[in-house]
């Protein structure tokens, strides 16, 4: 047994008005959520993606525009831009690797010829599924990308109205994290 003696220190005790654990927990949750949403994938460089070099400037401009939409609290616009940017990147990756994309089991086929459709006829859904199958995306990002695709489809006002979709800043930031995670996984796969 140890005995600690503190010399020349004064302790003051006072009655507490109460203990509010809930407020501390909510601060913790908000901090963790805020940290998650602000997290950056620092090693990502658009120029290192396996896409045509002529596309790089356009992708960088879109990423900057997404950041601007988020900074002025335009979540719906950000989500549309994030979804279309993901589609453009996946099309760019497929265009650099047509053989593996067209041989994938989930590649969309022309019903008359049985051959893979041209990439211009693919949907974001097709690009996500095939990118997962050929290893550019992992399952987690595949699933989140499909959710992003669903949100991006609210670009149609009647569909948005029928569901009552009103995204907030957090939804848009989560979508941006999905895009950044996809960029990271594509970059990592292209290095291997």
Segments (PLM) and residue ranges:
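Amphipathic, non-membrane alpha-helical segments in soluble helical-bundle scaffolds
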Residues: 1, 52-56, 75-79, 117, ...
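Short amphipathic alpha-helical interaction/hinge segments
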Residues: 93, 97, 101, 156-159, ...
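Flexible secondary-structure boundary motifs
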Residues: 96-145
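Charge-enriched, short contiguous segments at helix-coil
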Residues: 134-192
């Amino acid at each position: 047994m140890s005995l600690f003696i503190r010399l020349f220190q004064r302790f003051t005790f006072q009655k507490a008005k109460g203990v509010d654990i809930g407020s501390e927990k909510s601060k913790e949750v908000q901090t963790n959520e805020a940290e998650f949403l602000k997290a950056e994938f620092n090693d990502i460089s658009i120029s290192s993606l396996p896409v045509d070099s002529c596309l790089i400037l356009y992708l960088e401009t879109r990423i900057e525009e997404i950041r601007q939409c988020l900074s002025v609290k335009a979540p719906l616009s950000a989500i549309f831009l994030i979804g279309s940017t993901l589609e453009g990147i996946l099309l760019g990756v497929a265009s650099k690797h047509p053989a593996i994309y067209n041989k994938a089991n989930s590649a969309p086929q022309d019903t008359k010829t049985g051959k893979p459709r041209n990439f211009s006829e693919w949907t974001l859904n097709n690009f996500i599924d095939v990118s997962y199958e050929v290893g550019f995306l992992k399952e987690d990002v595949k699933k989140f990308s499909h959710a992003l695709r669903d949100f991006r489809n609210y670009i149609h006002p009647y569909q948005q109205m029928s569901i009552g979709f009103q995204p907030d800043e957090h939804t848009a930031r989560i979508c941006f994290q999905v895009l950044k995670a996809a960029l990271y996984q594509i970059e990592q796969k292209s290095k291997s």
